[in-house]
Amino acid sequence: MAGGIKAWPEDERPREKLLRRGAPVLSDAELLALIIRTGDSVTGRSAIDLGRALLQECGDLRTLAGATVSELCAVKGMGTAKATSIKAALEMASRINSERLMICSERFTSPEQVYNHYHYAFRDRRKEYFMALLLDGKNRIMREIQVSEGSLNQSIVHPREVFNPAVRESAAAVILVHNHPTGDPAPSREDLEITRRLREAGDIMGIRVLDHIIIGDGRFTSFVSAGLL
């Protein structure tokens, strides 16, 4: 449809559609258009055109969520302001999911539960993220701690980064969770050594390391299930 969105019939404009019928009826491109807000005068693309171009470039929302600001700006008509608005909106969605997990009163009784709760939060990450889940005596989440970002090594993942918060929260145990951006959840030598050091530190402090879950692409490794912990 030619022309700017304001020239469109009212019932076809994303904002009016949302107000009348609710957000679920909007397409992905229309939702992106509301985040982008304006089109680009140089290319003549409307906000919906830009949303469609982003989806065509990335393929789907999952890939879009993992795109960098620079990659978003590579789409003609996208500038820094539009790209950062998209990144902020997607980050908020990720945090909402994390908050939902944090208030969960369900006990973690299996590695599958941990994976099912966290794989959405980790699957689009292009760097390694290492997280510690602080648990109470009934294995319920008290708090999530992001320990490091980037390639794991012993200087970054230090026992104090895990156990200082655990002591402050009076945690009874911890579960370690991190991702492999390659999609292969097989533990590396560094993973094994870091887990050993954290387990030993936990034993000294009376805070058990219940498991270490490595999240890959659609699969995971549990150190306990694999006999590594």
Swiss-Prot record:
Keyword set includes Repeat: no
PROSITE patterns: MPN
Annotated motif JAMM motif, positions: 178-191
SUPFAM superfamilies, alphabetized: JAB1/MPN domain, RuvA domain 2-like
One example GO MF annotation: metal ion binding
CDD domains per the UniProt record, alphabetical: MPN_DUF2466 (cd08071)
GO biological process assignments: proteolysis
Gene3D superfamilies in alphabetical order: 5' to 3' exonuclease, C-terminal subdomain (1.10.150.20), Cytidine Deaminase, domain 2 (3.40.140.10)
Keyword Methyltransferase appears in the UniProt entry: no
Domain MPN: 107-229
InterPro entries: MPN (IPR037518), RadC_JAB (IPR025657), RuvA_2-like (IPR010994), UPF0758 (IPR001405), UPF0758_N (IPR046778)
Origin superkingdom: Bacteria
Binding residue positions for Zn(2+): H178, H180, D191
Keywords, alphabetical: Hydrolase, Metal-binding, Metalloprotease, Protease, Zinc
NCBIfam families hit by this protein: PRK00024.1, radc
UniProt similarity note: Belongs to the UPF0758 family.
Protein name: UPF0758 protein GSU0386
Organism encoding this protein: Geobacter sulfurreducens (strain ATCC 51573 / DSM 12127 / PCA)
